[in-house]
């Protein structure tokens, strides 16, 4: 009920501002985590003890893996498809256990999962996004309470439990999203005559963000001439294609929900009142007005186009998350932006006290093991997951190739992701800013 009511309200808000902005002269030329909770002292001790057993656990997993079972992982994240394919190949080479990884296309995971689960060889490993997803797939979720991946969680908060208290899912990645920005372009802008800020650090509210974006949009030709960029707009295109619209229909929509929950001191409700709907509308309006494209073409704009616009330095601001780091820094994509050029700031919507707001941090990625699979395949899947979080190969892949921040105690030292967005999230927390919880899953 909550999601349906919100969907109708926000869809109306989006359409209203898109049509209103179609003739707006501001549009550009037409041309993709930090652990918010601190570890308890007990968890810290457990982490220290875990360091001494990681290697042996990985060896035991490889030694005990049975050749009679197999693993079929239906992966949710297209960005990490190749890394999972590579990791599956390494595991099969070491153990002889077949591991198949199939990745659903952007925005199609639920329908793909339904289709695959109806087959005789269904996924043995899949994911749900949280309580809402669990409600749909609870009859397929094996109890992970005694599994290695559950035992290695740094906090019970990352275990997704059913009504009976069984662990039906385990979070495997903590993610953060906000407004990714190009430090180089923004810093260059700050040196211009009559720039509205002298440092990116001054952006700590919607009003300040809007003032900067409006000025960049109005002066993009001047910026290009002075610094040699090919800037097309302040923000990347806010595409409403299925590969992109989730950024606004769920992630952006989380902000008004978060502030309404915060005001009421609640964590869930059957239906929101829409207290911050106007705030949602104004940030959305800013996205589509100070953009690389006219509002009238947004329906066909894709996530890949937005990613490319940011990567090729055609835009300064790009709403997305930590998962996008790998794509933006992948040399094969030929992007101009580098890791050193990028930062992430909070999404400001004009809510009271937002100057103390951090980035949006949480998880909608929970591993679930299909309890309707054979016993051999269930055990093979549990062994594979144990190897992933304990072995050098698995941890290196998740931390570096995939760029994940994980909730597992085994990811320390060299296995902490070198992701600048995660570093920014940690810095906001260190500075006393409050992370925004995820309330849409």
Question: For each predicted feature, which ranges?
Answer:
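Extracytoplasmic/periplasmic solute-binding protein
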Residues: 60, 166-172, 177, 207-268
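C-terminal capping/gating helix-and-loop segments adjacent to ligand/active sites or protein-protein/ligand interfaces
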Residues: 361, 401-411, 421-441
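Short, well-ordered beta-strand elements
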Residues: 67-78, 97-102, 125
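Extracytoplasmic/periplasmic substrate-recognition and gating elements
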Residues: 94, 98, 119, 333-402
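Extracytoplasmic "Venus flytrap"/periplasmic binding protein-like
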Residues: 90-156, 168-169, 184-198, 316-317, ...
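Glycine-centered hinge/linker elements that transmit conformational signals in sensory
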Residues: 210-214, 264-300
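Hinge/lid segment of periplasmic solute-binding proteins
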Residues: 60-63, 129-180, 184-187, 225-230, ...
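Short, solvent-exposed loop/beta-turn-alpha elements that line the ligand-binding surface or hinge
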Residues: 145-159, 201-202, 239-242, 257-282, ...
């Amino acid at each position: 009920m909550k999601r349906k009511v919100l969907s109708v309200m926000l869809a109306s808000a989006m359409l209203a501002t898109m049509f209103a902005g179609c003739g707006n002269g501001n549009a550009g030329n037409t041309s993709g985590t930090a652990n918010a909770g601190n570890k308890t002292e007990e968890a810290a001790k457990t982490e220290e003890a875990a360091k001494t057993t990681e290697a042996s656990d990985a060896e035991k997993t490889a030694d005990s893996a049975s050749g009679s079972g197999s693993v079929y992982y239906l992966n949710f994240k297209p960005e990490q498809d190749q890394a999972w394919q590579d990791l599956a190949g390494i595991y099969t080479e070491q153990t002889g256990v077949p591991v198949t990884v199939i990745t659903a296309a952007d925005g199609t995971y639920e329908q793909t999962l339904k289709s695959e689960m109806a087959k005789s060889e269904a996924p043995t490993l899949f994911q749900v996004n949280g309580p809402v997803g669990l409600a749909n797939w609870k009859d397929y979720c094996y109890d992970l309470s005694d599994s290695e991946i559950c035992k290695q969680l740094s906090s019970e908060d990352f275990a997704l439990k059913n009504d009976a208290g069984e662990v039906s899912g385990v979070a495997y990645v903590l993610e953060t999203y906000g407004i990714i920005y190009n430090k180089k372009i923004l810093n260059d802008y700050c040196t211009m005559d009559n720039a509205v800020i002298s440092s990116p650090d001054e952006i700590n509210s919607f009003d300040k963000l809007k003032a900067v974006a409006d000025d960049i949009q109005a002066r993009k030709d001047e910026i290009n001439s002075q610094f040699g960029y090919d800037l097309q707009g302040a923000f990347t295109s806010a595409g409403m294609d299925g590969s992109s619209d989730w950024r606004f229909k769920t992630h952006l929509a989380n902000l008004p929900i978060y502030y309404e929950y915060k005001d009421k001191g609640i964590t869930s409700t059957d239906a929101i009142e829409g207290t911050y709907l106007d705030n949602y509308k104004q940030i959305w309006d800013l996205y589509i007005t100070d953009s690389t494209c006219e509002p009238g073409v947004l329906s066909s704009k894709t996530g890949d186009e937005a990613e490319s616009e940011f990567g090729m330095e055609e835009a300064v601001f790009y709403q997305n998350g930590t998962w996008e780091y790998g794509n933006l820094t992948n040399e094969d994509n030929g992007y101009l932006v580098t890791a050193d050029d990028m930062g992430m700031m909070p999404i400001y919507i004009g809510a009271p006290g937002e100057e103390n707001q951090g980035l949006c941090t949480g998880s909608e990625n929970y591993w679930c093991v299909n309890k309707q699979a054979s016993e051999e395949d269930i055990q093979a899947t549990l062994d594979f997951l144990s190897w992933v979080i304990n072995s050098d190969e698995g941890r290196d892949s998740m931390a570096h190739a995939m760029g994940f921040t994980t909730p597992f105690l085994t990811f320390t030292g060299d296995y902490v992701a070198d992701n600048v967005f995660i570093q920014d999230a940690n810095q906001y927390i260190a500075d006393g800013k409050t992370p925004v919880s995820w309330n849409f899953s």
